[in-house]
């Protein structure tokens, strides 16, 4: 059988029934070896487990047990859900043809070990527990095999250690039903770890609840070309300026909760000479100034977080050694990306853990600066790797193990820990993900939902919301970010503020900055007649959005999304319920020429405030202790222009009977009606 590829057909199997199991055995002609497939009905009476085993001598490269199966036609009101970033719903009536693969735990692949299928309001959950599973979603138009305009189908490839998957029939249901079922499965796998457990172990983790993510990416920005020649060295912020920015956020803008992250603090700057990080960048103030920054920023009540990397190494790093680097099957060094420090090479995760533990690395960072949070770049973002160096071989399972050990070691030193993007295998050993929500102000990085006619849904919030803080990553244009803000309101997550001007930005802001327009994507930089009037654009945007998203996260962090629905046929208006009593309605319509939805107000009948008129990018949040809206009318009051307004209980009692704080971000006229 060596070097022989077999395509197995089900009609050549010997089929046997054994109690609750169907056994299908394949024997190639004139061969003694066998492949056996099992289909077992589990004790819950609604789950089928598919598995296989191969006889000794038969090497399996790939088994596709589902091949264009579980298909749905355009007339069957169906869809497939994929857990990529927040979640993707791919309908069976999009009119598009495509084939898209989602590899388990890869970049924009399946970030959870599951898929869901709904057909005529009947739901099934597909689960597995192995990183060597690859899902394929296929859409075919006008197939001759079935009388349908479109067929949406699913395939699963099992490779190497992947031997099984399960299909659970959930009966009448939708993607919320599927998410609830998978949440219980995640607990059985050991991926689930709640906020309560994490805060009990690391009390500072509570500071993430309601915290926005403020990140100064490159304090020192050193650029090399492909020949490792230095092109430029730029100081964007000294450590003293870093401190003043944090103090400005707290004292001038009133930002109470923040995850304050700095990158480019290491010896040669951002993405340079890893893993040789010390002393801190001399151009920015050396160790002494960074230690002072850490102390002062922590004294603000913030999480002070340092950005680091134990996957990339550069040829000019003092620790450079080919012995550290992953090897491909043909023995070649494995390349990473081309970053500020030039061509990066990928450190084997076993060796990366050893480097992190060196006295001059994380232990010394703890001793010198004592941050109360830490971030390791790329640890969760990159897919799980294999290494073929005989000195430190890795399977994907091994790579996961060593990365989890790096997380837990970092937690043991600093407390709060996070990394890039996020995968469910990292939930038990981290406190925040940076990048799972979105990338550069968009829902995805390279994946294009429109190519599949797909919609983003808050799937992650239905499964793991009460386990971890999650953010987007990279900079974006604050003056055109309204849709991104509305998306964050739907998922109830604080924003990431990663776009900054050099130095003390508010002192250097130009006089002619855009002021925003009420009905387009610049609406959240407005401040006319509001609290933020007179501030620079960055500060207006921060204040307007933080005052909505921070308290929304605070009151919902330990709940899950229990309801999500579209209130209009074009999907522009969404209704979300967190837990039992936090209701959110958003209008994603745009007032801008050429946008997908076009200008349209939406009238929402609120139980609290009666008729609420939501303009393009309007929203209303209603709960017993927090109310916020961007609306043209609320509680019987009509406004000439959309108003952004928040009302919050200060004592935990319902707003109608408590001491409250009011924040008017922009308006022409405003009132608050209160029983008291």
Where are these regions (language model features)?
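Carbohydrate-recognition beta-sandwich/jelly-roll modules
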Residues: 1-259, 264, 282-284, 300-303, ...
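Residue-level recognition of well-ordered secondary-structure positions
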Residues: 51-53, 250, 298, 305, ...
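Short acidic, gly/pro-rich beta-turn/loop elements at beta-sheet edges
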Residues: 60-62, 73-75, 270, 314-316, ...
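Short C-terminal domain-edge/linker segments immediately following a structured domain
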Residues: 80-85, 94-96, 290-293, 336-338, ...
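Glycine-centered flexibility motif
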Residues: 83, 269-270, 285, 466, ...
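Active-site-proximal substrate-binding groove within the catalytic cores of carbohydrate-active enzymes
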Residues: 129-134, 139, 153-169, 173-178, ...
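Aromatic-lined carbohydrate-binding/catalytic grooves of carbohydrate-active enzymes
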Residues: 207-358, 367-376, 380-391
């Amino acid at each position: 059988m060596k070097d022989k590829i077999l395509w197995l057909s089900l009609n050549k199997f010997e089929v046997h029934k054994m109690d609750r199991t169907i056994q299908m055995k394949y024997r190639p002609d004139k061969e003694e070896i066998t492949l056996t497939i099992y289909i077992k009905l589990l004790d819950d009476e609604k789950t089928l487990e598919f598995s296989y085993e191969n006889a000794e001598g038969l090497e399996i490269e790939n088994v596709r047990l589902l091949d264009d199966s579980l298909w749905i036609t355009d007339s069957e009101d169906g869809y497939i859900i994929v857990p990529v970033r927040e979640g993707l719903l791919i309908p069976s009536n999009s009119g598009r043809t495509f084939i898209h693969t989602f590899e388990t735990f890869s970049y924009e692949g399946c970030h959870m070990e599951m898929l869901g299928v709904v057909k005529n309001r009947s739901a099934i959950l597909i689960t597995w527990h192995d990183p060597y599973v690859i899902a394929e979603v296929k859409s075919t138009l006008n197939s001759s095999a079935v009388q349908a305009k479109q067929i949406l189908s699913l395939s699963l490839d099992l490779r190497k250690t992947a031997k099984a998957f399960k299909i659970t029939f959930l009966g009448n249901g939708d993607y919320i039903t599927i998410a609830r079922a998978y949440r219980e499965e995640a607990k059985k796998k050991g991926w689930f770890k709640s906020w309560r457990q994490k805060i009990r172990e690391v009390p500072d983790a509570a500071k993430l609840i309601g915290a926005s993510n403020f990140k100064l990416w490159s304090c020192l920005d050193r650029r090399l070309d492909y020949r490792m020649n230095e092109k430029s060295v730029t100081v964007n912020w000294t450590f003293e300026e870093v401190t003043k920015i944090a103090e400005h956020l707290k004292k001038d803008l009133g930002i109470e909760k923040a995850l304050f992250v700095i990158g480019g603090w290491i010896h040669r700057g951002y993405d340079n000479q890893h893993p040789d990080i010390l002393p801190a960048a001399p151009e920015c103030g050396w160790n002494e100034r960074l230690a002072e920054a850490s102390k002062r920023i922590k004294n603000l009540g913030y999480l002070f977080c340092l950005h680091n990397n134990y996957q990339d190494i550069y040829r000019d790093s003092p620790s450079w050694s080919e012995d550290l680097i992953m090897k491909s099957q043909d023995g070649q060094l494995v390349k990473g990306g081309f970053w500020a420090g030039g061509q990066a090479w990928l450190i084997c995760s076993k060796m990366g853990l050893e480097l992190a533990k060196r006295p001059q690395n994380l232990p010394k960072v703890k001793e010198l600066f004592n941050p109360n949070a830490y971030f390791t770049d790329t640890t969760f973002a990159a897919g799980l790797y294999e290494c073929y160096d005989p000195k430190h071989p890795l399977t994907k399972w091994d790579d996961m193990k060593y990365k989890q050990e790096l997380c837990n070691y970092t937690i043991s030193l600093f407390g709060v820990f996070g990394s890039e993007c996020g995968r469910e295998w990292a939930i038990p050993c981290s406190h925040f993900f940076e990048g799972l929500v979105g990338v550069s102000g968009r829902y995805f990085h390279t994946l294009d939902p429109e190519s599949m006619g797909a919609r983003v849904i808050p799937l992650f919030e239905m499964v793991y919301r009460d386990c971890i803080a999650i953010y987007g990553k990279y900079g974006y244009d604050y003056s055109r970010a309204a849709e991104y803000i509305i998306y964050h309101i739907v998922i109830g997550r604080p924003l990431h503020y990663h776009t900054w001007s050099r130095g003390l930005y508010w002192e250097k802001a130009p006089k002619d900055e855009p002021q925003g327009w009420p009905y387009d994507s610049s609406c959240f930089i407005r401040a006319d007649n509001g609290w933020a009037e007179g501030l620079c654009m960055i500060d207006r945007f921060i204040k307007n959005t933080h005052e909505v998203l921070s308290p929304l996260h605070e009151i919902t962090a330990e709940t899950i999304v229990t309801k999500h629905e579209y209130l209009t046929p074009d999907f522009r208006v969404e209704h979300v319920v967190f837990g039992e009593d936090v209701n959110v309605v958003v209008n994603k319509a745009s007032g801008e020429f050429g946008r997908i939805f076009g200008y349209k107000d939406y009238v929402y009948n609120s139980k609290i405030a009666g008729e609420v008129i939501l303009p393009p990018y309007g929203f209303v949040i209603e709960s017993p202790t927090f109310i916020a809206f961007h609306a043209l009318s609320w509680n019987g009051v009509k406004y000439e222009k959309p108003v952004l307004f928040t009302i919050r209980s200060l004592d935990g009692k319902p707003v109608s009977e408590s001491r409250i704080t009011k924040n008017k971000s922009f308006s022409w006229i405003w009132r608050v009606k209160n029983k008291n």
